[in-house]
């Protein structure tokens, strides 16, 4: 059985930053998930485990200011995006999570959940992958993802001789300052919405 190193289409036309991070380098993702994330999640909690995983990834990719800034930004971005989309998916009972669902979700619990399930049975076609509003929401999140990737990708200027060894932290911050930290502000807004939900 041949295993892929990456799933290029999911990196080039992404649904979410989570999907990009997972599909960019499958062997490294599997290793980091098994040996860093899962090992630390029970002791530190999911948020700290995500950041520890990105720290390990930074070390494996070469500890430069440029790589560290981009990967730690990705860590924060993916955590916020995953959390926000999970909350929205649960509230709307829709397939708008950061990763595609293998099968429809099953809701259990209180009478309110039972009533929501009844309403959702009536409106089921509106909540699945193929419905127009779910496609629209996922498309908007996909466009936001492409914006973040372009912003983070500005750090990797192939025309400079310094790129081979990696830029310093100060250089990376000056590039982002020139862009008014636009992507970081956008993620801050999403983090606030996530916190309010």
Language model feature labels by segment:
Residues 1-197:
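Non-catalytic, membrane-anchoring transmembrane segments at the edges
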């Amino acid at each position: 059985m041949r295993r892929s190193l990456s799933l290029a289409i999911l990196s080039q036309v992404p649904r979410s930053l989570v999907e990009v991070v997972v599909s960019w380098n499958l062997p490294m993702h599997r290793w980091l998930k098994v040996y860093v994330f899962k090992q630390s999640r029970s002791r530190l909690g999911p948020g700290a485990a995500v950041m520890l995983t990105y720290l390990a990834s930074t070390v494996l990719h070469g500890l430069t200011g440029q790589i560290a800034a981009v990967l730690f930004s990705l860590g924060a971005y993916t955590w916020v995006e995953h959390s926000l989309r999970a909350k929205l998916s649960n509230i709307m009972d829709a397939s708008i999570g950061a990763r595609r669902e293998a099968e429809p979700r099953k809701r259990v619990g209180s009478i309110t959940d039972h009533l929501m399930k009844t309403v959702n049975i009536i409106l089921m076609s509106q909540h699945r992958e193929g419905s127009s509003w779910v496609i629209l929401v996922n498309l908007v999140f996909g466009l936001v993802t492409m914006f973040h990737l372009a912003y983070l990708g500005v750090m990797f200027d192939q025309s400079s001789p310094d790129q081979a060894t990696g830029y310093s932290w100060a250089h990376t911050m000056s590039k982002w300052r020139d862009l008014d930290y636009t992507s970081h502000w956008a993620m801050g807004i999403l983090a606030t919405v996530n916190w309010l939900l």
